[in-house]
Amino acid sequence: MATTKSSYRRIFGGNPRSSSSGNRYATSSTRYTLGSAMRPSTSSRMVYSTSSSPAVFKSSSVRLRSSLPPARMADSVDFALADAVNLEFKANRTNEKAEMIELNDRFANFIDKVRFLEQQNKILVAELEQLKGKGTSRIGDLYEEEMRELRRQLDQATNDKARVEVDRDNLADDLQRLREKLQDEMIQKEEAEGNLQSFRQDVDNASLARIDLERKVESLQEEIAFLKKLHDEEIRELQLQIQESHIQVDMDVSKPDLTAALRDVRQQYENVAAKNLSDAEEWYKSKFADLSEAANRNNDALRQAKQETSDFRRQIQTLTCEIDAMKGSNESYERQMREMEENFAIEAANYQDTIQRLQEEIQNMKEEMARHLREYQDLLNVKMALDIEIATYRKLLEGEESRISLPVHSFSTMSLRETNLDSHPAETHSKRTVLIKTVETRDGQVVNESSQHHDDFE
């Protein structure tokens, strides 16, 4: 930051002269003349120049010249001229005393103003140090803590979002797997319904076959009953015939071969009847066993088909319930995911607003710190100008004291030793003091400060 130019005239109402190279303060020369014998002259010049950092202040301060030209006086002292000189000297001394009082008052005012400005400078420096130290660190700590909290919440929200996305992907995979399983179950259901239809057809066919077999069994039972009845009638007829044959045998004893013949016939009929009865019973039993076995088979098939149908129905109901539950869970997860995305978007917007607000506060603090630094730099420049002005007035006071004491001494010498004034030439003293002050500033702060004094005598 370049050195800021300040004007002493704007603050204290002085009359500094400024040029393109910097600020220049010059004081006018004062010359007092004592007749033709004494011409003391005092001239002082203060030069203050500023440039870019590092700044160099060169002060060519007080150059005092006091000359006593050779006094040319007559052999006798002109007392009238001496009285005039005394009156003029008293008038000049009165004026100089008034000027010194005014300068002392102005110098006291300047000292008060310098003290006040030094106190204000200390207050501003303390505030600046406080802002640089505690304020900046506190705001920085708060900002860092807030940023860490926001980063932690952002990481947590990112992790939650990633976890929700993983859950969503897992649910999508589960839903896809359940859909595939549902398709398989639907295919199996269709196959089961086809099998059930075929089983129903088989059951119907088995029922028809069972009905046919039952009708056949009834017809066979009727036929067996008819045959049994016929057999009983034949047996009765044979018994009647046998009885009749016995009667005839009794009546006709003379026929010896009839009994044997009847016995043979009866034996033959009994054999035929027994054979027919056994054959009929065996055929009936075999047919009944076949029909019973077929009926049992059909009943087993029907029972198995009914059981499979009930199992398939239970599976269909279970899968339907699972599908409904999965649909509800999927809708719930999707709703939760939408809510979490909305909450995450709202929180992200709030975090962005908080970050923007903190950045604006940091920018405002930086601008305020820059303003304090500029004010501090202006006050520092004013302080330097006041230091230079005080040094100038100090040199002027020293020059005035030397100028006031020098004519009195010369006048007493002239009055008492007039012979020596003719024989000794006046001595001319010239003292030149050069003060070189180097102040290096960086970013509005004094980094290095050094001063050098050089005294030259002429």
Swiss-Prot record:
Residues 147-238 are annotated as: Coil 1B. Residues 89-124 are annotated as: Coil 1A. Residues 125-146 are annotated as: Linker 1. Residues 401-458 are annotated as: Tail. Residues 96-404 form the IF rod domain. Residues 239-261 are annotated as: Linker 12. The gene is vim1. One of its GO terms (biological process) is intermediate filament organization. Residues 1-27 are annotated as: Disordered. The record marks F344 as: Stutter. SUPFAM superfamilies: Intermediate filament protein, coiled coil region. Homomer. This is Vimentin-1/2. Vimentins are class-III intermediate filaments found in various non-epithelial cells, especially mesenchymal cells. Vimentin is attached to the nucleus, endoplasmic reticulum, and mitochondria, either laterally or terminally. One of the most prominent phosphoproteins in various cells of mesenchymal origin. Phosphorylation is enhanced during cell division, at which time vimentin filaments are significantly reorganized. Residues 1-88 are annotated as: Head. Pfam families: Filament, Filament_head. Residues 262-400 are annotated as: Coil 2. Belongs to the intermediate filament family. It comes from Xenopus laevis. Signal peptide: none annotated. GO terms for molecular function: structural constituent of cytoskeleton. The keyword Coiled coil applies. Keywords: Coiled coil, Intermediate filament. GO terms for cellular component: axon; cytoplasm; intermediate filament; plasma membrane. It comes from the Eukaryota.
